[in-house]
């Protein structure tokens, strides 16, 4: 297998608005990130993916960009960004930029021009269609609720926005649009960034017939079959690779919701000349109800395990996995997949990390995950800031599909704001995130969960993550070893072996709050070394009773 730096890296995702505020305005910023580079170096991560920091009206927290070559004023200046790059590189840390090119903000100069008239030179930068029978061109619904089309009275036409109406979709069929994007990417690569995480990149190619979508319990049709992994997607990404990516030593990861194993190989196969890896969301999207993620049901562990094993086995040797359990769009991983009850929070956070970091692929740590930060469980609608949560609350309650009480429970479990509360640095007011009033409330458990306390405690979640990351740097088997699943049908245990030449590694995790019984594979009963354990287990007999949420890793050469 070909060795590359991005296969051997551990990526840390920063959501800049909530990471560290350096000037007391309640909003995280670039100087705040610079202040914390030594903390990140101590953790051991060597790549930072930073969510968008470019000029934006912040309708969707920066995923609505109004200028691709300017830093958002509340985050700082271009000079600050250049300092961040230099300081990170000095510490051996690379920087990935969040590339948002499925859509722009409606305040981007291209769109301001585009909507002026039907013959404006920028008209074809976006997707405009005539009304059909005085209504929307088709029945597609947007990701954040409502129609995916917005009527513009000035020219009596509709524009497409798969996300909010302030996020009009770019028309990738137009070669001028593609040139603009590639020029902009080259601009940032020349500045010295180390790669791109590509936001909803699988949506840039649309079926130009724009047919109606299937109605799935909602008010609108599903655009998925016509604009996710669309007809020209691989042609566009190959062109992007030729025009930009192949010229630099950069890392790329595409956000590709709904991707299959076969499709992932097209995006990220070694011989494809498109991307290095993709984010698949199959394990994240399990446990959906009639209205997608808006449900109070727990996830199905066996289904989760089956999906994780499938991606390990079927992508092996063909494309590279991205390993993650959380990001800025998901609830906190310890609340979703572990147990955030204080009795089990730390051990289940360590167990989840063990399970993920011993697999083949590039692991991603979302800010605060290394501390075991939990969902915030806001119980008042006015505390929420997330556009998706607020849109769906209105849509699903006003149409009588869900009661306000039930929808509040769904938000507490599934809202994106769970991941967006401020980073918990210490026990001071504002959790050390800000000296001012934070843009969103701090999780009240910052007194118990914070970086300052964990840095002092050798048994903390932070130090456990640090050790997992160090092991990955030291041992090729963790990065490149083959994967073999054990206990496929067990209701509680997730266990697997990794192999590289004469070396073997066994990872065992109990995903439940009950004890679980297992037999060690014979190879590991004698002379195996315990690399890491979340409960200090010393004795590894043939028969083992695992404690709730226990995890350990054994190594044999």
Name each model-derived stretch.
Residues 1-529, 533-557:
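Active-site and adjacent substrate-binding regions of carbohydrate-active enzymes
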């Amino acid at each position: 297998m070909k060795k590359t730096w991005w296969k051997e890296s551990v990526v840390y995702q920063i959501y800049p608005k909530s990471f560290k505020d350096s000037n007391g305005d309640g909003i995280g910023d670039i100087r705040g990130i610079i202040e914390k580079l030594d903390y990140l170096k101590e953790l051991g991560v060597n790549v930072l993916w930073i969510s968008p920091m470019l000029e934006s009206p912040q309708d969707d927290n920066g995923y609505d960009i109004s200028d691709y070559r300017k830093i958002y004023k509340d985050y700082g200046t271009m000079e600050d960004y250049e300092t961040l790059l230099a300081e990170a590189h000095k510490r051996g840390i690379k920087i990935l930029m969040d590339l948002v090119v499925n859509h722009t903000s409606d305040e981007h100069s291209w769109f301001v021009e585009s909507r002026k008239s039907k013959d404006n030179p920028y008209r074809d930068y976006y997707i405009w269609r005539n009304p059909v029978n005085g209504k929307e061109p088709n029945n597609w619904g947007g990701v954040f609720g409502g129609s995916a089309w917005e009527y513009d009275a000035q020219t009596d036409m509709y524009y497409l926005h798969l996300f909010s109406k302030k996020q009009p979709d770019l028309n990738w069929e137009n070669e001028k649009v593609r040139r603009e994007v590639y020029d902009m990417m080259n601009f940032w690569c020349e500045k010295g960034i180390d790669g791109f995480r590509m936001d909803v990149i699988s949506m840039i190619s649309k079926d130009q017939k724009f047919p109606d979508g299937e109605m799935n319990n909602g008010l609108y049709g599903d655009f998925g079959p016509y604009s996710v992994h669309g007809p020209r997607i691989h042609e566009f990404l190959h062109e992007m690779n030729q025009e930009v990516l192949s010229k630099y030593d950069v890392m790329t990861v595409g956000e590709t919701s709904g991707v299959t194993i076969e499709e992932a190989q097209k995006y990220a196969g070694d011989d494809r000349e498109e991307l290095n890896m993709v984010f698949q969301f199959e394990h994240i999207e399990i446990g959906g109800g009639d209205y997608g993620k808006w449900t109070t049901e727990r996830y199905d562990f066996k289904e989760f395990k089956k999906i994780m094993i499938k991606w390990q086995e079927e992508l092996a040797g063909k494309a590279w996995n991205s390993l993650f359990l959380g990001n800025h769009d998901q609830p906190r991983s310890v609340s979703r997949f572990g147990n955030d009850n204080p009795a089990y929070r730390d051990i289940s956070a360590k167990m989840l990390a063990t399970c993920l970091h011993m697999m083949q692929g590039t692991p991603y740590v979302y800010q605060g995950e290394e501390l075991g930060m939990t969902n915030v469980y806001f119980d008042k609608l006015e505390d929420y800031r997330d556009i998706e949560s607020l849109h769906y609350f209105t849509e699903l309650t006003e149409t009588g599909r869900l009661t306000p009480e039930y929808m509040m429970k769904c938000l507490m479990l599934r809202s994106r704001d769970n991941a967006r509360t401020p980073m918990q640095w210490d026990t001071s007011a504002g959790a050390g995130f800000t000296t001012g009033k934070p843009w969103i409330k701090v999780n009240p458990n910052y007194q118990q969960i914070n970086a300052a306390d964990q840095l002092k405690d050798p048994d903390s979640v932070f130090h456990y993550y640090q050790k997992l990351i160090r092991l990955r740097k030291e041992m090729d088997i963790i990065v490149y070893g083959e994967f073999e699943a054990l206990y496929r049908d067990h209701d509680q245990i997730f266990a697997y072996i990794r192999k590289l030449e004469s070396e073997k590694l066994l990872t065992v995790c109990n995903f439940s709050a009950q004890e679980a019984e297992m037999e060690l594979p014979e190879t590991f009963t004698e002379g195996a070394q315990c690399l890491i354990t979340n409960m200090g287990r010393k004795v590894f007999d043939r028969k083992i009773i695992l404690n709730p949420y226990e995890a350990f890793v054994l190594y044999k050469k």
